[in-house]
Amino acid sequence: MDGFAGGLGVRPVAAEDGHARLEFEAREEHLNPAGTLHGGVLATLVDTAMGLAARSTAEDGVPATSQLTVTYLRPGRPGMITATAEVRKQGEHLLVCDAEVEQEGRSLVYALATFAVVRH
């Protein structure tokens, strides 16, 4: 994976038919002063997973995040993190996706996003 998410170490596992899955190894440098996984890292994971899911369905155009709601359920710790995403509704100009981040089988984050399909 290239760009910002790739620089963090995010690894795409699958992205097809409106579904995506990512893996991420959280390390000490990803923690906040409280010693838990920084919320910005978790937001990046859900946005990236939903973007991959959205792109897997967009035949013509590029989905761009227009709204993102992130609900933090519990803190993350160093270790393997998994993010999964799914396109829930697809229209001509907008897509709605949701995503979940898990660690050791426990939900850390639930997110919902709207993507605008940008055509060039």
Model-found features: residue ranges?
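Non-catalytic linker/capping segments at the edges of enzyme domains
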Residues: 1-23, 28
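Short connector loops at helix/strand junctions that flank enzyme active sites
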Residues: 5-7, 17, 45-49, 63-67, ...
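Short secondary-structure boundary/capping segments
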Residues: 12-13, 62, 87
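A short interface-forming secondary-structure element
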Residues: 26-32, 42
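A short, polar/proline- and glycine-enriched secondary-structure boundary/capping micro-motif
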Residues: 32-35, 120
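Active-site helix/loop of acyl-thioester processing domains in fatty-acid/polyketide metabolism
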Residues: 37-62
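HotDog/MaoC-like acyl-thioester-processing domains
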Residues: 59, 74-78, 82-120
